[in-house]
Amino acid sequence: MSNYQQESSYQYSDRSNNGQQQEQQEKKEVEHSSYTHTDVKVNMPNLIAPFISSSAGLAQELVGEGFQASVSRITGASGELTVIDTEAETEEARRDMEAKAREQELLSRQFEKELERKTEAYRKQQEVETEKIRKELEKQHLRDVEFRKELMEQTIENQKRQIDLEARYAKKELERERNKVKRVLERSKFHTDIQVNMEAAAGSTHSGSSSVAVSESEKFQTNN
């Protein structure tokens, strides 16, 4: 365990209210270190020096047994000092602020230009895409019109075929009905017999007729 004490010296200068005299006085302090000063002694606290020991490994191979290392901590204290910027530092700070403002304005203009460029490029691309979509929609509309036209024509053609089909089969059905009627009429004209019998107190009367059709002529025979 070891004790360490450090003495710190602080130099305070007398300054007048006049700024010019104060600046000259500071320059003298820089040139003469023995100007009016005050020594302040501060007792440092007792600190335990760190103790690092190693009995094996790389340290042992390098320095052998009993390798020890010690580290001491040194601390110091400072008093409050008044910091005054010089004219050169003030001018430099002003130039830095102006340069910063110019760079910020330049960055803003560059950002706005880049944003405008990208926006214009996007707008043109959208116009091209929109034009493509419009033309494609026009083509699609024409295709729809053609499709509906073809669909209507096909529908009308199908209805005509349906009507023709119905008419054809209706004609055949009428032909069959005509043949049936014709056969019935021919059969009834071919042989027709009429018999009439009347009974009375005075006697009876019998009457009969027979009709036979040959072509369009008819032969009638009557018996009383």
Swiss-Prot record:
Alphabetized UniProt keyword annotations: Coiled coil, Cytoplasm, Repeat, Stress response
Biased composition (Basic and acidic residues): 24-38
More details: Trehalose, a disaccharide essential for several organisms to survive drying, is detected at low levels or not at all in some tardigrade species, indicating that tardigrades possess potentially novel mechanisms for surviving desiccation involving tardigrade-specific intrinsically disordered proteins (TDPs).
Presence of the UniProt keyword Cytoplasm in the record: yes
Name used for this protein in its record: Cytosolic-abundant heat soluble protein 77580
Conditions for induction: Expression is highly induced during desiccation.
Biased composition (Low complexity): 1-13, 200-215
Subcellular location: Cytoplasm
Region (Disordered): 1-38, 200-224
Ranges for region CAHS motif 1: 122-140
Purpose: CAHS proteins are cytosolic heat soluble proteins that seem to contribute to the anhydrobiosis in tardigrades, but their specific mechanisms are yet to be identified. It is possible that protection during anhydrobiosis might occur via the stabilization of vitrifying small molecules such as sugars, but not via the direct glass transition of CAHS proteins themselves.
Coiled coil: 83-191
GO BP annotations, alphabetical order: response to desiccation
UniProt free text on domains: CAHS proteins contain 2 repeats of 19-mer peptides designated as CAHS-motifs that comprise each two octapeptides connected by a tripeptide.
Organism field: Hypsibius exemplaris (Freshwater tardigrade)
Classification lineage: Eukaryota, Metazoa, Ecdysozoa, Tardigrada, Eutardigrada
Spans annotated as CAHS motif 2: 159-177
Major site of localization recorded for this protein: cytoplasm
Protein family (similarity comment): Belongs to the Cytosolic-abundant heat soluble protein (CAHS) family.
Traits of the deletion mutant: Affects slightly survival under dry conditions but does not affect survival under frozen conditions.
